[in-house]
């Protein structure tokens, strides 16, 4: 491609991305066809899927992951999509797609999914592991923490364990919060 063609493609790409980010999917897709050979074309597809994560199907996500396994944005899109599934309480979908992650919000959704599909005991055991961490956990954990606190797994020993960990980690706000559970 010559300079003029590259400049035109770059301009078209920018416009298509802008449309995608504004939720104007039809306009973005109309421009997408002319960008099939453009090196950043996968990022336009990323933007299109991102703009409608709540409506994006498992098949669409899987197809994107298969087409672009090495694209740096692929794991991010997948995590964002999984979080949307958690927000929508799509437990079977989430449960079938669990994997080891350091993302605390996803971990909470995965445990909630495990509970939601009936593996209650294992989910409550995993909840204990999440709850004892000496840091505040994401809001996504709150529903399963609520259930867990109503079980025999919740004890003064565990409260003190987390309290001590929070103090050692300098998490004073969490330590103050935990005092409500101390008797």
Task: Show the residue positions of the predicted features.
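Alpha-helical solenoid repeat scaffolds
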Residues: 1-183
């Amino acid at each position: 491609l010559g300079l003029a063609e590259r400049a035109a493609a770059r301009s078209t790409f920018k416009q298509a991305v802008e449309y995608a980010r504004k939720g104007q999917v039809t306009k973005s897709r109309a421009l997408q066809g002319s960008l099939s050979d453009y090196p950043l074309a996968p990022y336009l597809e990323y933007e299109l899927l991102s703009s409608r994560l709540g409506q994006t199907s498992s098949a669409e996500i899987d197809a994107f992951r298969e087409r672009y396994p090495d694209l740096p944005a692929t794991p991010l899109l997948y995590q964002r999509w999984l979080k949307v599934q958690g927000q929508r309480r799509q437990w079977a979908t989430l449960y079938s797609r669990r994997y080891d992650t350091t993302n605390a919000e996803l971990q909470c959704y995965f445990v909630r999914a495990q509970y939601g599909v009936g593996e209650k005991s294992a989910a409550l055991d995993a909840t204990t592991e999440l709850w004892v961490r000496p840091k505040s956990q994401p809001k996504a954990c709150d529903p399963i923490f609520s259930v867990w606190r109503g079980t025999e797994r919740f004890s003064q020993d565990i409260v003190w364990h987390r309290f001590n960990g929070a103090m050692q980690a300098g998490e004073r706000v969490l330590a103050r919060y935990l005092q409500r559970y101390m008797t």
